[in-house]
Amino acid sequence: MDGTRISASILATGFEEHVMVNDGEIQHLRRCIELATEALELGDEPFGSVLVAAEGQVLFEDHNHVASGDRTRHPEFEIARWAAANMTPEARAEATVYTSGEHCPMCAAAHGWVGLGRIVYVSSSEQLAAWLTDLGVPAPPVRALPIREVVPNVAVEGPVPALAEQVRDLHRRFHSST
């Protein structure tokens, strides 16, 4: 593990808990923000995700592709598909998914069904909903739920306040241009 750890306060099921995110994890989360920026630059919603093996190597990364017309082309869903096709059940369970935003219910379900391990996210569904409301964006067709309401036994860490404002800015930019 890297030496420096950053404490992030999260709200989960009505109580506050602290999570620790180390330097390596911050680098993966920054890569997620870079991928989200790439999506934005391509005219897509700004989300990015990285799948990392237990040993620390990046296995797969992607950003949103919903502008293609297929609303299921979320990076977290693509990670689940890739992992199901390319990893053993044991390797999936030991892997970590880093992502710019908390999984939506569809992606959380895919994560659970495939048997992926821990999730670390920069911004929560609750934060995103508040940001979009502030921007006057209509509610999506699927209600946002915390990951643990969809996959109760998965290890989840986030949000990471030190990076969340960068994600908020990407959403502000996307929705001000649409």
Regions found by a protein language model. Name each.
Residues D2-A39, H103, G112-T178:
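Zinc-dependent deaminase
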Residues I33, T37, A80, A84-A85:
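Generic structural signal for well-ordered alpha-helical scaffold segments
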Residues L42-P46:
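Short, flexible loop/turn motifs enriched in small residues
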Residues F47-A53:
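Short beta-strand scaffold segments in enzyme catalytic cores
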